[in-house]
Each structure stands twice: as structure tokens, then as C-alpha cells.
Amino acid sequence: MLSSTAILKASGDVAINYQQYIYPIIINKLSTLNYTIKNKKYYSQYKYSIQFQNEFQKNLKIYNNSNNNNNNNNNNKINKNNNNNNNNISKFFIQNNNIDKKVLRHFYSSTKLNYAKQQQQLFKNNETFNETVGASLLPIINKLQENAALIGSEITLPQIIVVGSQSSGKSSVLENLVGRDFLPRGSGLVTRRPLVLQLYQTTTTSRNNVNENEDEDEDDNYYDNDNDDNSLEEWGEFGHTGTNRFNFQEIKEEIERETERIAGPNKDISSEPIVLKIYSPKVVPLTLVDLPGLTRVAIEDQPPDIEEKIKSMIIDYISNPNSIILAITPANQDIVTSDALKLAQQVDPLGKRTIGVLTKLDLMDKGTDAIDILLGNSIPLSLGFVGVVNRSQQDINNRKPIEQMLADEWKWFDQHPVYHRITNQLGTKYLAQKCNKILTKHIRDTFPSVKNQIRQLIKKYESDLEKYGEPIPLRSAEKSRLLLDILNEFSRKYRADLDGTNEELILNEFNGGARIRYIFSKAFQSTTAAAATTSTDNSGGGEPFGWLSDQQLKIALRNSGSTMFIPQKIFDSLIRKQLERVREPLIQTSEIILDELIRILTQADYSHVLSRFPILKERIVEVSNNALRKLVKECNQSISQMVDAEMSFINTNHPNYLYQLNNLLFSSSSSSFVVPQGAFQSTSSTSSSPTSSSSSLPLPQNSNPYNDALNPYNIDRSYPIDNQIKQQQQQQQQQQQQSYQQQQQQQQKQQSGFLSRIFGSSSSPPSPPSPPQPKQQQSHEIQIQQQQQQQQQQHLKKQNLIFDDKFKLEQYGLNDITEDEKKQIYLLRRLLLAYNDIAQFNLQQNTMKLVSLLLIDKSKDILQKELIDSLYDQSSVDQLLRENELVVAKRNECIYKLDLLKKAKKSLSQSENSDLLHLY
């Protein structure tokens, strides 16, 4: 490979064979330039590459043809052309001598790299590598960006987010990238909505569909710097205006109008983006999102929390893991105070997706520079820093063309004593190419995740659309069929919930039939048991027959005519009273099940079907409730009849009852049988006695009477009793005993009870034998007590006193219950409890069966018929099928978003197979 000087020397020597010597060097040079462009090295050579290729493409074609043609005439023609082109080669190399040296030097160091095939293909297409990839991928992402703006923030697309404080030069950077003035300017907060800026590189001039309102006044000379035809090559389109084209002055005005329309006339902000597409042959394919500039102090017409609002908006955008952060910081301020870098570090602490941009490098104090920052020595960023020079306010006022500014920017960097060493890594053009390369690579890397997001969103909206259903048909026959289908489906799912055959699996709670079974097995049994086990104070929580005190049993025994046994009639009466107490809880069971059935009717499984038609839903619930309440009324009557049937026949021949009876007979027949300690209640106050005697024994705290003698009372018989009250009790006892004896003699002749089987059937029931006690063993205290009783009795007879209401029979304490009575009371209560268990079990089981048969099963059978008979009417179909407006709006939204997502998925699928995704 010859040096540049040798090339120049050879090109001036006509004796050198042009065909064999000069053209191979040109081919190598072209390959070098293409390789250089591909790697974005020596950015200053870019603008010469197309010129170089165009100048020698024709000659190369002649050269290639000459290799395949041995005709002497053609060779003579080529030699003649060679002589004519020598001058052009010399002129070109002389003008670009310095460029040529750099290019050839870079080519020498890269001879081992093999890019020949790729370079030749790029050369044939006359395109650079990055332009090809960017032009193919970015339009797809831009289209997705537009759809994402319409769909919402549900897709995390790869995009470059421009972040910076006010007056940081953010707007100037964007305008430099576009090469046009198009952003509104002014004091305070100007950018008040996100601006999605999509740059499309065009290659041909289009005169179609140009905005008819485009003005061609003197202002166009400012926006069209080169010639008047540029207005046809460059234009803008907004996402909210369709395909209408705008020139750059109109773009600025439309941004202001659209911002004020959404964000209001004051200085408030809005998160709804503006989508702007700019078509120009001068731009690099790129997508940027310009956000409002950070501010610290709210000015006039701004809300006081404007700073927090802007920060929150910026965080929402840069938190997207697929976004690239373009953090803009003015170089004439301390880098550690950069608001943009501070926010970027919050979401990207490692700096893997942050590009730092230093603006206003020309405004730094003399003797200072930002070379350490640009080289990454101060703040390390994986994507590095890029320095740029913006137009000054005077340049803007003087309408200095941006192309002239870009040339001045390059000249300033090239002549700077420090920055000239890294000129190829500075400037607006380098920033554009760097962003293009990073974004293009990022798009390729995030394609799978974006495609997966779109797939998931399609699945979600299809599911939502299925819930909202198809639009209502217009024909009457189709409407009637739809109504019938809804009623049938409603009834089917109701049956499925009760039977446990619902397709939807619920794991967080009992549902349908499982809840009903739980109510039967747990809640229902505990409720009826609590109603049957009422304590003596009628507060609940005691034992069965807790409402029946031992004193009442003693009185019942004595009222039966004997102190030794009780007739069957008294036993039956006590059992019936106990069964009557559970009648209401059993009836309430059907009401509990009714509430559960109503809950199932409005269950979430098919609530979405009814939510479409609020009138139909209301009527279905009304008809269903009426049908269920008819059933529950019949069910309650059957439950009440069942209780009456249980009370009508007290079956003392039940095997379980006989088993308990035999056990009691066996245990009580033993001579050593003793009534368990504490098996008797220590109070005579009952639910039937409104007052309690002052002589009754106190009830110990925390006592649980009659828990199978496991929790006995601690009876304190030493409780002091007033002497006068005691004397009155003794007098009452004597007179009452005489009355009882007379009644017993009469009743024993007429009645006999089941307890006679325990104590015999003689006219005088036997009492447990007790050894006679000699008189000398009786205590002197007892003798005195007997004498006092006799004296009091005689005194009462003389006074001809009668019993007052306060001397009621239930006021007798436990002291007057004999051992025989204790035994009888104990045995009687145990038999009552034994039969109560049998009766309670029968009632609970039969109640569950009646509720299942008459309410649950019957509701499954009649619900569909009731709904069709009541609602399937041709005259009311239109009214019943009137849709909820909210459902209609949501369905239309789903259809719209599904259409956008499916188009996006199609675009991604077509691009996924493109070789351009695999070139990097």
C-alpha cells in the first residue's frame, strides 16, 4: 500500500498504468472509508464519503468491465478515459490530503479485520451501515410509540428521554439535532407536555399533500436556509392531526395550541404526550422524548407544587428499564449540582443507560475546561459524555442558520487547544450518530421483551372483551336468542356453583355448595346447640336444660304426687319445653341458607354478564329472590311441622335412651351409689321466677352447672340465714309437707310413671335404706330446732296466717331436699339429657335434609323456569337488553386497543426475521 504522497505522484505521471495501479488503491480507499463510517471513527470524513463514491463509481464500473473484456478496442477506450481521470484524481487527493492521511493510517491498523463482503454490499446500496439499520428499525418503534401513546403507558418501549433543567440548553440540542427551529421559546416553563419527537430521514422530495395553508412569506427564508424547495423536502406531522403536514413555523404554533388545549392557559403541566414526526433528508433516524425542564421556584400562574409534579413525571419516564436517559447539563455550572444527573442516578445508579451531554462549553471561564468530565474521569457513565456548543441568544435573535452554527461548532472544537484531541467525539452530529447507534442496538436487544409485552396485552384485552361481550344485535330474533342464552347460562352456572362443578377454581375461600356444607356442619349445629343450652339466668352458654333448676325439678316431683318418682306426663312436658326452644333456631337455618343462595346468585363468576345489562340484572335478582322466598316459606313450615312431630311422640324406647337408662339403673341399684358432689345447683332463681329469695345460697363465680358433674358447684351450707326468715321457712315446710302427702296419696292411685321402673310400682315408692340412728346420737341442736319449729307452727295456726306471695315454693333452698330427692333429681336430669341428645340429633339431621330438598335442590329445578316465564317476553327484550354505557365505552376501547396491538405485533413479527437485527 503506497502512501498518499506516492498516490499523488503516481496520479501525475502519465506513464504509469492507470488501470493496474491507481484503481486498486481507490478500491482500498473506498473500503477504508466505508469501514470507518461503519465504526463511526473520524466523523469528519462522513461528508466526503458520498462525494468520493459518486465521483469514482462510474470509473470503477468501467474498470470492472475492463477486467472481463480482453478486447483491444475497449482497452484503448479505457486508457483514454484513464488519462482524462488522472487530473480528477490529483485534484481530489490534493483537496483532501489531510483526510486521506488519517483514513489510510486507520486502514493500516485495521488490515486484519475482514469486512469485505459487508462493505461491498453497503457500497453497492450507496448507504452506510447505521443509516440502513436505523431507517429500518426506528420506523417500527416510532409506530409502536404512537400506538403506546394511544394505548397508555402499558408498553415499555426503547426510547431516549431528554432530561434537563430550565436554561440548560435542552431545546437548542433538540433543534440542532433536527437542524430547524421548531420549539416554542419564552421565559419560564415553556415545555409543559411530553413531546415525542420522531425523526424520519427522507431521500426524495415529495410535493403531495402539502399543507395548503403553508405560507411563503419572508419568514420562510429563515426556516429554509438553502433554497425555497427545502420546504417541500422537510415537514412535520402531528399524531393528533393525522397526515396533515406543517412547516416548521406552523409546528411551533401547533405545539403551543395543543399544549394550551390540554394543560390549560396557565403554566401547569400535563403528562399526556404530543407526538411529532419530522421528515427531512438532513436528520438521523431517531426517537426522542422531550420532557418539561426542571424548575425550583413556582412563578406566576404556576401551582406551588410544580417542582414535585415535574420530578414525578420525569421519574415515571426514566424508570422505564428500556429507556435511554439523555441528561443535559450546562458546562458552566458545577457538575455535582446537575439536576438531570441526580434524577438519572436515582433510577440508573450504575450509569448503564445514561448519556451525559455537556452544553455551553464555549461559555466556561477562561483557563477551565471539561476534558476530565468528557473522558469519564469525574463521573463514570457507560455511554459516556458528549460536549456540544449551542447558539447564543444573540444568534437566535439574528436568526443564524443552524447549518452555519453546526459548522462553527465543528470549527470551534477543532481549533480549541484541549478539545481538538477528541474532536471526533464532540459536536451535535456526533451526538446524533451516537444516539442513533445506541438506540438502534437497544431496540434490537429489547425486541423480545417488547414483543412479549404486546402479546400479554393482547391476551388481557381479549379477556376483557370476552367479559364485555359482543355488541347487541339489531334484529329482534337475535336479541330474543341472546336474552334466552343469558337466562339459561345464568341458571346453569347457579347449578354448577351449588354442585361444585364450576370451571373456575377458587382457592381463597369456600364457595357455593362447600359454603352450605360448612354452614350445616359447623355454624348450624353450633347455633342450635347454643339455643338449647341456656343457663339459669337465660343468658345462654350453659348446658341442656340449663333453664331448669334443681329446685324446679324438686317441685315437679312433689307436684306429681310423690317424692319418689315422676309420671311420664311430666317427663314429656319437660322434653317438649326443651324442644320448643330450638324451633326458632331451626327455622332460622333456612334463612341463613337463603342468604347464601342469594350471594351465589350475584357471584363474580357471571356478574360480568349481568353488568352489561343493569335492568336485566335487577329483574333477574328480583325474580330469583321471589322464587327463593317462596321456597323458604314452604321449607320453614316443614321444619315447624317436623318439630311438632318430634314433640308429639316422646320415644322412650329408643335404643340409645334405653342404653343410658340401663346404665343409670345399674349404677343406682348399688348400695354404695352416692349422688356426685356438686351435682345440684345452689340457687333457686330461674328464668321463670321473677324474684329470688334472700335465703337462697350464693352462686360461686365461674361455675358451669351440670357439665356431667365435671364442673360441680362448691355449695357452702354455712351461709348465715336470718332467724326470722328461717322460722318462716320451717313453718312453710311443715304445712307444705302435709299438703304434699295428701296429694301423693291421691295421685298414686291414678298415675304411675316411667321412674317406677327404677324405684318399683308399689303405692309407696321405696326409699334408699338408711341405718336407724339412736336418739342418744341426735345432737342437742337438732332437738332444739324441732322444738322451735313446732312452736312456730302452733303460733301460725293461732294467728290464722296464710301464705303471702313472697313465700313461694321455689324459694326453698337446698337444705330441705332429702337424700332421696337428690337421687331422684340427679337421675331425672340424666335421663332428660339423654333423651335431649337423641331429639336434638334427629332435629338437626332432618332440618338439613328438609333444607336441602325443599330449598336448595328445588331452587336448582325451578329457577330456570321462573326466569323464563317472568322475563322472556318479546315486548320487553329491548328494555332488558339496554347496555350499560360504561360497558359500551370499555368494549369500544378494548376493540380499539386490540386493533393497535395486533398491528404492532404484525410489524414486530415482520421485522423479527430481518437480517438487520443481527448485523450489530
UniProtKB/Swiss-Prot annotation:
Region G3 motif, annotated ranges: 290-293
Record region (G2 motif): 190-192
Residue ranges, annotated region (G1 motif): 164-171
Residues engaged in binding GTP: 164-172, 359-365, 390-393
Annotated region (G5 motif), positions in chain: 389-392
PROSITE patterns: G_DYNAMIN_1, G_DYNAMIN_2, GED
Coiled-coil region list: 724-751
Compartments it resides in: Cytoplasm
Keyword GTP-binding among record annotations: yes
UniProt biased composition (Low complexity): 681-705, 724-751, 775-790
Any single GO BP term: intracellular distribution of mitochondria
Any GO molecular function: microtubule binding
Chain intervals with Acidic residues compositional bias: 212-236
Superkingdom assignment: Eukaryota
GO (cellular component) term, any one: mitochondrial outer membrane
Region span, G4 motif: 359-362
Name by which UniProt lists this protein: Dynamin-B
Lineage of the organism: Eukaryota, Amoebozoa, Evosea, Eumycetozoa, Dictyostelia
Gene: dymB
